[in-house]
């Protein structure tokens, strides 16, 4: 049996909060659903017998009807070709004891929704993000150790959780002592494992091949350097292959010293459909200058076909030579910096943290101009 494996589609991804004027969807949602539609077509073209989605079909459980409709069209197309579909619940699919995949349960005989561990004798072990883990904080290691050991020659393991040593989405390493280890997965008797949860395509060190398949479409800036695609695994031969996706939206992170260097870079680049993050690394006064002139940068960027551009502060907190800061009252500076520090504490996701601070800066600038 040939199985096509993907993970973390996040079909209603709202990163950057940029809406398409025609559909009203966020553009990263459009990117995600297009990638999933491509995955479905590739599964059909490569004549697989089954697809497995290893969690996080959605970015959050409250999604739009348009996203559901496009997902259903992919599932109908696969069912029409006689391809089985197994969808595992991920942590982003859940809201307490409810998960957004429940509307698909019983929808078609070709589709199976898994929200609790399941061992398919002679084929595979599935460990989704479960209701118990969502509501009762059951340990994944306990769940895995309680599963029956596989006895088939080419037994595949699918799981949606963190594994020790894996690269997280923020590029740090998963070092938690409670995280599942490669040894835990090997103890199930599996001969290969495909995982979801972290979005980077990576192989975990161990005695069997253990992969995070990675999401097909980039989710955020930190994803952009990695390869994108999905796996095909043959349970008869134990062989697997990687199929690459070449149509990710361009995303660029660029360091700039000041406004003039930002203008120069934007004039010379190809920004068609791109999302660009400028990181101000000069003096803090230069960052403030960029922020004050951001509309000029946005007009230039938009004229070049760009989708979205924003700037983050990577300068020192205070510029002793910057007249703009010295003009401000110390109370206002302290309030702004205090709020930014609070945002750093409360929002663990780097990209969301940066965007929230950017919004705070914009609101602060607007209030000052009144």
Name what the model sees in each region.
Residues 1-69, 350, 354, 370:
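N-terminal active-site segment of His-dependent metallophosphoesterases
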Residues 38-46, 74-77, 146, 265:
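A generic secondary-structure signal
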Residues 43-47, 149-153, 269-271:
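Glycine-rich phosphate-binding loop signature in dinucleotide/nucleotide-binding domains
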Residues 50, 61-211, 215-218:
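His/Asp/Glu-rich metal-coordinating catalytic cores
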Residues 58, 132-134, 283-288:
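Short acidic, S/G/P-rich loop/turn micro-motifs used as interaction or catalytic elements
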Residues 192, 196-259:
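A conserved active-site cap/scaffold subdomain adjacent to cofactor or substrate pockets
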Residues 235-370:
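Accessory, non-catalytic peripheral segments of nucleic-acid enzymes
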